Amino acid sequence: MAKPKGERKGKSAINEVVTREYTVNLHKRLHGVGFKKRAPRAIKEIRKFAEKQMGTPDVRVDTRLNKFLWSKGVRNVPFRVRVRLSRRRNDDEDSAHKLFTLVTYVPVASIKGLQTENVDASQE
């Protein structure tokens, strides 16, 4: 059914600052990738995942996440990784985008049974 003419859509949630935790399955994203390109491709796939989930083209990857992905070498990238995606306001005045996404590594004992969670600002 069509909406009445005077009714307006709600505010887009993409402009809000939000933080969520995700589990990224790198195994399926790196299937068929040559050995010497696996760790670099893993970084690119996480960037692509963050861009899609948060809707911001500006994605920044934390150094601890980079170190974790490279920890077993260029070939043997971990199958799954738990990440925290944080959509934040860009303080830089001359930047092209108002928001950016910061991707940080969340160390967990076991990946099993975890789901996507919203993280409060107090927990960050």
Curated annotation (Swiss-Prot):
Gene3D superfamilies in the record: 3.10.440.10
GO MF assignments: structural constituent of ribosome
Keywords, sorted A to Z: Ribonucleoprotein, Ribosomal protein
Gene Ontology BP annotations: cytoplasmic translation
Pfam families: Ribosomal_L31e
GO cellular component, one term: cytosolic large ribosomal subunit
InterPro entries recorded: Ribosomal_eL31 (IPR000054), Ribosomal_eL31_CS (IPR020052), Ribosomal_eL31_dom_sf (IPR023621)
UniProt family annotation: Belongs to the eukaryotic ribosomal protein eL31 family.
Protein name: Large ribosomal subunit protein eL31
Protein's organism: Spodoptera frugiperda
Lineage: Eukaryota, Metazoa, Ecdysozoa, Arthropoda, Hexapoda
